[in-house]
């Protein structure tokens, strides 16, 4: 947990003093990539706000962190509007194509197909992307600068090239199937003297002209171009080339809509901790963990002690057990959010914890009657990107975006990676005769673990946090919250 405080200090030091002319009072920028941070800084310098800067960041991350995120994927955004004193949550999660059915990841005998590469690589795993729609809708409602201006940095960087990072290079090194999928193989690998494909080296200047063209079209024509124009056609063509029976259609792209959802908030140690509601499982699972932990005097425990590690592990197991059964797309499933956070239910779950030994098995609870789902069966590989921005007016963004696994489906269109988000659904639609809440259904959003979070104290923004990491995201963010508020 001490490493968390070091990270917290570095992030906020960079945001307040890392840019030459950016005074502490003018804003905070914390991203996973220096190019993205610079793009955001340039927007803030021009008078843009947190939303404007977020758009610039995401467009650059698509280029520089294709292994983790991109406009071919989805995102959740929390936005604090300081003038309105209101928190907004925007759901830009991908959706399953309308023709997708619960047997999407099943063999003919009803068993689940092999996860990698069968389920991941190719058209089968690709959901309808949501990021561009999210960014445009946020900009229409809150942005200050012109839409096209927010694309300039990413377009120029795509044309002139960026330095391959160690993170990108290392990911390329272990994805054997990516070497066989074009155009990604030709873009991110080179041949050695033996004719073997090897990752481009750290520091190599990589240009992406196709992505520059895509950004230029969207900058001029807006999200409509992505969902109905040439970019939409390129997406469908890429899927058809990979699988002639690909399920996604132009209508699926055209009909995609984001959802403005009510933020999910709860008190912890007198602070108001807010995150995303379902289809993210992050906010609900984190708040369950915090409510269970609040009854323990963990401030007296060493963060790295055996007692604290044991307690956190047991709390996490209890919350994740409920997550596996009850969380999914709320537009399809009645999720017992209030019941899962009910004090009496939390007390029952807390009483299952033995401070001296780990439970042999942890079962889901029963938050209310007449709810009976099978256990979610999915495999999530660590990926994703998170960033936070506060502008000089105090507006704040906490946003997590992803293409799901490393390099998503491995397919590309218009210079960007297409997600493999549908593997976030349960691979098995039914367990022991019970339907799984997070099963595949047409137009449904898969459950996510992304947990963008904003913490408030006395009605004002106190801290912003979030993380990459697949299903471990929830644990990471919960640890950062208790690290900040308890220690």
Where are these regions (language model features)?
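Short, small/polar residue-rich loop motifs at catalytic or cofactor-binding pockets
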Residues: 260, 381-384, 448-450
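Internal maturation/activation junctions in enzymes
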Residues: 183, 295-402
